[in-house]
Regions:
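A short secondary-structure junction signal
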Residues: 2-8, 39-41, 51-60, 85-87, ...
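Short, acidic Gly/Pro/Ser/Thr-rich loop/turn segments
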Residues: 50-54, 81-84, 127, 146-148
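Generic recognition of flexible, low-complexity loop/linker segments
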Residues: 63, 107, 126-127
Length: 181
């Protein structure tokens, strides 16, 4: 049996990206914060309305030159301004596409609604886009065959400039996220 792990919320929250790619990560089951799990990783992502997350597109499928291998599940919740989730009219977008070295070619651009679940077992994925007026939350759960648990990823080199661009942009002031109602 594993010992009980207690982590203070303020130690879990990370602000990632900047500009319209600012989002909040709650890394409650990241290997650094929850070291006793064997395979499972999990984080929550909060994307303000009009912003993108899971960006730049990345992969962790163990194919080609990417050494990280995790399947990933996205569980989406779509809200309205000042409401955490449960909006039946709102939706967002998610993209998953093949890397050049993949044996199968695909490019899936899908709309996601409140309560949708999406499995990423290979390829690049991102961005997730929250439409104006509809903030997006998702729970990411990752696990894979690696002997050492990790949340590593390989960015799509086409978008290598994105992380550099963030250095010249301000973070979105809506993050950290607060519900005002």
């Amino acid at each position: 049996r594993f010992p009980t792990v207690y982590v203070i919320k303020s130690e879990l929250v990370e602000i990632r990206g900047s500009g319209s790619a600012t989002r909040e990560i709650r890394a409650f089951m990241h290997p650094d914060n929850f070291p006793n799990a064997v395979k499972l990783n999990a984080v929550e992502v909060i994307t303000p309305d009009g912003n993108t997350s899971s960006y730049p597109p990345h992969r962790h499928d163990g194919i080609g030159d990417c050494p990280f291998h995790n399947e990933e599940i996205y569980y989406f919740r779509i809200g309205e301004i000042d409401s955490p989730h449960g909006c039946s009219s709102g939706f967002g977008f998610h993209r998953t596409y093949s890397a050049p070295q993949d044996s199968i070619s695909f490019d899936d651009n899908i709309s996601v609604r409140d309560g949708d679940i999406y499995l990423v077992d290979r390829g690049y994925h991102g961005p997730c886009t929250a439409l104006p007026g509809y903030p997006m939350y998702y729970l990411n759960v990752l696990a894979g065959p690696s002997l050492e648990r990790n949340m590593g990823f390989c960015d799509d080199p086409t978008y290598s400039h994105i992380r550099q661009d963030w250095k010249t942009q301000r973070t979105d002031p809506r993050i950290p996220w607060r519900i005002s109602k």
